[in-house]
Design a protein with these regions (language model features):
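Long, contiguous internal "core" modules enriched in hydrophobic/ aromatic residues
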Residues: 1-265
Length: 266
């Protein structure tokens, strides 16, 4: 599922950088264009400090910018990944637009950047991901923030060889998760012992709710089902138990994927 998490990471970066550029311009530094001073899109006044994250987040972003502009990388003790596009802009242009900057930001820093946006900016991004008219704007924003945090932690768990069944989903907004799961999840999945068992299923549902691309949705479903099919019961046509129980995937959930999304048969 890593490639689908990467797809959503790139989508978040694209949507965030578009909103920031549209609202606050394309220069990372305040510049005078001859007709007046143009402020930076990283100006503190453009962001909310409701969770006391503004200064630390902007500092993290600025560290990447400074590193990209320092040819000898002598600034500070940290090392950062600098994309070829950011390196090009840092050395050949007089500004670095946000859609270039995000190519070198980690998923974590990008998520923090989203978290310090003003409410109206978050709403634009949340609405572009989630189009369900039955959810309020606040519910969409809450779901997007917690969902992005969860799949980021899930990716980090996979990358470090951790147990995917340890994913903590207790804080995921249940109403939105159930509403956007197309019937794949219900309230029982978020009660008692089912909370741990439903972790991977919740991750899959979140990915499907945020991808917003039919081809990618079908590809994700097909990948999950193909892998699950390797462990089906040998004497029936149903999805079997065993390793997939340990992963928190049920036959009911997998059959739901086939029925709800009409995935190609295998």
């Amino acid at each position: 599922m890593l490639k689908y998490i990467l797809y959503i990471e790139r989508a978040l970066k694209s949507k965030l950088s578009y909103v920031v550029a549209d609202r606050y311009g394309v220069s990372e530094e305040a510049i005078d264009d001859g007709s007046g001073l143009i402020s930076s899109y990283l100006d503190r006044k453009n962001y909310s400090n409701s969770h006391n994250l503004r200064d630390t987040t902007l500092r993290s972003i600025t560290e990447v910018l400074d590193y990209s502009k320092d040819a000898e990388h002598t600034i500070g003790n940290k090392k950062f990944y600098i994309s070829s596009s950011l390196r090009h802009y840092a050395t050949r242009h007089n500004h670095i637009p946000p859609w270039i900057l995000v190519t070198s930001l980690s998923f974590g820093v990008t998520t923090q950047w989203y978290s310090i946006l003003r409410s109206a900016d978050k709403t634009r991004i949340a609405n572009s991901f989630i189009r369900d008219p039955q959810l309020t704007e606040d519910e969409k924003k809450e779901y997007l923030k917690t969902s992005i945090d969860l799949i980021r932690r899930y990716r980090n768990t996979l990358a470090h060889g951790g147990k995917t069944t340890d994913i903590f989903i207790g804080r995921i907004p249940k109403k939105q998760c159930i509403q956007l799961s197309n019937g794949l999840l219900c309230r029982d999945d978020f009660t008692g012992d089912n909370i741990t068992q439903s972790g991977v299923q919740t991750v899959i549902s979140i990915l499907l709710s945020l991808i917003n691309d039919q081809y990618m949705e079908n590809a994700l479903i097909q990948d999950v089902i193909n892998l699950f099919w390797l462990y089906r019961s040998r004497d029936t046509d149903s999805f079997g138990k065993g390793i997939w129980d340990d992963l928190g995937l049920s036959g009911e959930f997998m059959n739901g994927l086939l029925q709800v999304y009409s995935a190609p048969s295998i």
